[in-house]
Amino acid sequence: MSIDIKFTINDILFNQESLQKKNKYTCPICFEFIYKKQIYQCKSGHHACKECWEKSLETKKECMTCKSVVNSYNDLSRCLMVERAFDKKECCCIYSFNEQIVEGGTNCSPPDGASDQNQRKLIKDEENGCKEKIEVDQIDSHLINCQYKFVTCSFKGCEKILRMNSLESHQNECGFKLVTCDFCKRDDIKKKELETHYKTCPMVPIDCSQGCSVKIERKSIIDHIENDCCNTQIPCKYFEQGCKVEMKRSELQNHLERVNHQNYMGILIEKLTNQVGQSKKTHDELLKKIEDLSLLVIKFSDACLKKQVLPKALDICSNGYRNKWIISNYSSVAKSKLNCQALSSPMLSILSHLFQVCVYPKGDENKEYISLYLRVNNIEEPNSLKVEYSFTLVNVLDKSKSITKKEDKKVFISSEGWGWGKFLLSDLINKENGWLSNDDKLIIEIYIKILNEEYEPLES
């Protein structure tokens, strides 16, 4: 972020005294240089800045120098030659200075918000400041691109103020720069804290504290000492069986070869044999428990299934079965069917009976109509089934135009189908009439109720 130095043209203009003596490039009223000012003159050639003319003409309609009549700006003319001549005067860059806050007065104007006792002082920086000489009209463009302007470091926490041309080298070494640990790959570590981080980083390789000459990641050092380090003091592997010798891990093999452990091995084998026997017994007991639990799960599942299925079955007995059959891509499917060829719905399992709905897009016998039938597939003669059923052809544009046909009581024998051969003219079934949805689906609502058996009264 760049830091602007507040300045006046007096701070940077060359040959100020000479220019002021000529009285050509200063306003004779406010005595300021005409930097970024518009200069106007009366008919007699007396000039002043626009701001001074405005204040004067508010009270007096006359020239401030010769007292000639000036009614408005229309009586004045712009002094462009003077303005342009001043624009070509040379000055230095404000960034050729260093700015310091000093106590007491100075020949420079205080910045906004600074008191008279706490003012700024510009000190020429011959070594590091900008060396360019520029013309007055180039000041703004030069300051935008000047490589000697003051900037702050962009890294959070760093309050360093430096010149832009040294920013890159500073940021490469800035202690607040975020760097990545080569070991744990954390990428939020300040550069100045990296060495401290290495002292606690769990991934940094460190020397084993037992002098085994192996470097281990800090996080794994305890595991290394307990399980791998050749200098760790460990007991004989037959310690529990009676050999109480302790040695370095690197000496264990030599100890086992040098000392006869046959008696200890016998004790260990006996112990392991007992453990194997106990494990087998525990294994058999667990298998028995698993079998018992499996039986309980089966019984529990059957009970739950009955609780779920029974209410649904009772509802179907009382109110009947309702569902929808949605036939996708009906237009192309219907076109592929020949006369008397049917579309069959998935099987409907209702109270142990299997039903199926059949649609004939081009009719079973009546070629101009769509036909709908209901079939029961698992009735064997001489048995029969009394059924109440209905089909509703849904109009998706206007539900009130949907067509419903109902059979109050039909006796089904074997797998014969019952329904309506002339349900609706086939040519009417399209999207425009509402019988097909926009995605070419035909919707049929199905209602089926199995009627209770009727029994003859008992007589005696």
From Swiss-Prot:
UniProt keyword Ribosomal protein present: no
Cellular compartments annotated: Cytoplasm
Comment block on domains: The MATH/TRAF domain binds to receptor cytoplasmic domains.
Principal subcellular localization: cytoplasm
Coiled coil: 269-294
Alphabetical keyword list: Coiled coil, Cytoplasm, Developmental protein, Metal-binding, Repeat, Zinc, Zinc-finger
Protein role: Probable adapter protein and signal transducer that links members of the tumor necrosis factor receptor family to different signaling pathways by association with the receptor cytoplasmic domain and kinases.
UniProt GO molecular function: zinc ion binding
Record-stated family: Belongs to the TNF receptor-associated factor family. A subfamily.
Record's protein name: RING finger protein DG17
